[in-house]
A protein has these predicted regions:
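Beta-strand-rich recognition/accessory modules
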Residues: 1-10, 40, 97, 103, ...
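Acidic, contiguous internal or C-terminal segments within carbohydrate-active enzymes
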Residues: 8, 15, 19, 100-149
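Short strand-coil-strand connectors
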Residues: 9-11, 31-33, 62-64, 119, ...
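Acidic-aromatic substrate-binding/catalytic surfaces of carbohydrate-active enzymes
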Residues: 13-71, 226
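A short, structured loop/turn motif at beta-sheet edges
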Residues: 60-64, 89-95, 117-122, 149-150, ...
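Short, charged beta-turn/beta-strand-edge "cap" motif at the junction between a beta-strand
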Residues: 66, 72-74, 131, 257-262
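Extended, loop-rich substrate-binding clefts of extracytoplasmic carbohydrate-active enzymes
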Residues: 69-120
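Active-site/ligand-binding surface loops and adjacent short beta/alpha elements
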Residues: 135-137, 144-212
Length: 262
């Protein structure tokens, strides 16, 4: 069993996957241009078994109130798998599969799998959560940090959400849906026809983030990077919109990045 870095190539595209650093995508290079912010905490990390913040780190699991560590006090953020070591199940020139077994502090055993597939103009990731025992609520999503500037001007973010989740003082959705507001964002949006966000680096590259999932968090309040995060439910969704993983029904999502030079 190995968790050494994996390099995938197709055409002039190259992806590095880092199983040993939380199962994150460490690099996406197109030609000689790096699209992801570099650094141990950056790249693109998996959010699982929840996305964004859980209010006070607590969620109802059947009749049991579960408490997660408050890693973003007073809340718990972005799941546990990004802090663990994943294992490589298989790898080839342009495809790889890695897995992670859920352990404490998450209260239930389960397995998370990510499948990565690279072509010369697209990169697709599928993530699933399976249980062999108890059913439990879970979410999956991804948190990429795209470099704001690739050398020729700041990225433009274009998308047409149906609504924005109103954000409360505690940083969590209030439950009200509002008209989408202009940037700056650290906000969750509803896209009922599927996530479809276009990033344009003027004169260089256009990249589309697409998913059949209906929720996306967009975060552009940092100077170095912009985050476009497809996910299976909104922040605090383990409480507000719980979706169960059962022995016959995994939670699964797919995200595709596709690009073209300008």
């Amino acid at each position: 069993v190995s968790n050494e870095d994996i390099t995938l190539t197709a055409g002039d595209a190259e992806v590095t996957v880092t199983p040993g650093n939380g199962g994150r995508i460490g690099s996406l290079r197109i030609g000689d241009v790096e699209l992801l912010r570099q650094g141990h905490k950056f790249g693109c990390f998996p959010m699982v078994p929840w996305c964004g913040r859980i209010r006070d780190g607590r969620f109802l699991d059947g009749a049991t109130l579960q408490q997660m560590p408050l890693n973003a006090p007073p809340h718990a953020i972005h799941g546990t798998a990004r802090d663990g070591a994943w294992r490589t199940a298989r790898t080839g020139k342009s495809e790889a599969v890695i897995t992670y077994d859920l352990v404490a502090p998450w209260p239930h055993p389960g397995r998370v799998t990510q499948l990565f597939t690279l072509t010369e103009d697209a990169f697709t990731v599928t993530m699933s959560v399976e249980t062999y025992e108890d059913s439990f609520p879970a979410q999956v999503g991804w948190h990429p940090w795209f470099n704001r500037n690739l050398g020729q001007g700041d990225v433009q973010v274009d998308f047409t959400p149906a609504w924005q989740e109103e954000r409360g003082e505690d940083h969590l959705p209030t439950g009200h849906r509002i008209e989408p507001k202009p940037s700056p964002w650290d906000d969750c949006f509803g896209m009922p026809d599927g996530v479809d966000v276009t990033l344009t680096w003027p004169g260089q590259l256009e990249l589309k983030v697409a998913s059949r999932e209906q929720w996306v968090v967009v975060y552009d309040e940092q100077e170095a990077a912009v985050c476009v995060e497809p996910q299976t439910g909104p922040p605090n969704g383990l409480n507000t919109r719980p979706r169960l993983v059962t022995p016959i029904d995994p939670v699964e999502a797919t995200m595709t990045w596709s690009w073209r030079r300008l």
